[in-house]
Amino acid sequence: MCCLCLSVYYAVPRCPILTNERRRRILFFGPSLFKWSITYIFPVKMRVSLQYVLFCSLSISSAEAEAKAPLKHLAPETCPWNPTIHKLRPPACASPDFIRRLVLPPSSSSSSWSGPEHCVNGTCVFSHAAQNGGIALITSPQHAEIIQEYAVEVDGGAHPPPFYAEEIEKKGIGLRASRPIVKGEVLMVRAPTLVTQVEAFAELEVGVRDMMYDIAIARLPKNRRDAFLTQMGRDVHDKINTNSFQFFVHGAGEKGIGHLGCYPDVAKMNHDCRPNVHYRITNATITTIASRDIQRGEELTVSYVDVFLPSKERKERIRTWGFECACALCQGPKNETVASDKRLRRIAQLKADLNNFKEMKVTAETGVEYTALHEEEGLHAHLGSAYTRAALNFALFGDEKRSREYALRAAEELSLEKGPESGDAWAMRGLAEDPGAHWTWGKRREVQK
């Protein structure tokens, strides 16, 4: 089958009775047939090698069809039409060095980054076999440079890990605590195995996108590649969609560009609408922290959806991942679910009132109710923002004692949620130190007068 495909690609550009338009139509539909045949017949390494052959065969055939004279190497910004990137923006062209790196295995040592490789529309593959056990990127060169600076060695979290993996009923593989875990304990610190720019994930033509996935995965060491491929999902695209965590890469003078990071160890944690583990991503590194005390044998969970959504919406979003939510809240008595939704509506209303500075809809005690509802609802990973609003509200009413008390609570929770050096944590420490000097001091008390 593959020999036939390659023969067609070699012969079509040379056929004197075909117009250029007919050549292009034949070559356009060929990649899908070739992609299907090698995807279901050959393993990853052989598949990538065959895709290299296809890519080079197409480049050579297209060039010979366009001109009888020897083709000169073009500048990196220009390139002749190529059927593998049909209907996409103009690609970055292949220089002689690019072709050499594309066809041959990376010649660089394992102590340095390889790439850019296989660039399409400014999106390229980068990899490092030794960095944090192996990492691959599918992104632009400028964002790859930033991420490469991010990817420092990490300590891995608690040693030995206070959890183990096992099959959990109705959920598949999950993690359970092997000993009691205290609130705030760092469980895992992991660098990503694969990082994909959101734009490349969503906008590249499927055949080109999947080829870049295969090349990136093939660049990983076997243990990292196996860990990625054993995640839930039909194919690489589905595994990224199901198991990745989004973060933003900030270049100079630009808004954050969304990227999807795959962390196979962290992805083993199942969903719960009231999770006991919180995570934060800093410079592409994910840190997981116990958001409350966890008993031995208890499952470790994170939330895959916005925990402030009503139960019906949470369940609908969970179904998009191909499973039903099996958490205690969603599977519990209906009256408890109804009560939970009522608390969530009240939380949303109080938040709006606390943020409303045009109308006096709150009292000094509103913040107390707001934080109490978070605690009752089990929103442990969001107590920092709740205490922050309460502390600011007390400051607005000129209540020094309780403003300081809630600011200290907020700083403690925010240190867990966002990190001890986060701007929000420092802001609350500043409020606790001198409430009277804060810009909010007494503002609502003045309005009351």
PLM segments and residue spans:
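C-terminal SET catalytic tail plus cysteine-rich post-SET Zn-binding segment of SAM-dependent SET-domain
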Residues: L260-E405, E412, W426-R429
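Residues marking helix boundaries in flexible regions
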Residues: L18-N20, L27, T39-F42, S61, ...
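Acidic, Ala/Val/Gly-enriched low-complexity intrinsically disordered segments
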Residues: V8-V12, E21, V44
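Accessory low-complexity/Zn-finger-associated flanking regions
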Residues: C2-C3, G30, F34-K183, K401-K449
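Conserved AWS/pre-SET-to-SET junction and N-terminal core of the SET lysine methyltransferase domain
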Residues: T139-R179, K183-V206, A267-A290
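Catalytic cores of histone-lysine modification enzymes
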Residues: E185-R274, T320, A326-L329
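Cysteine-centered motifs
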Residues: C2-C5, C15
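Secreted/processed peptides and extracellular or luminal domains of membrane proteins
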Residues: Y9, I85, I99, V125, ...
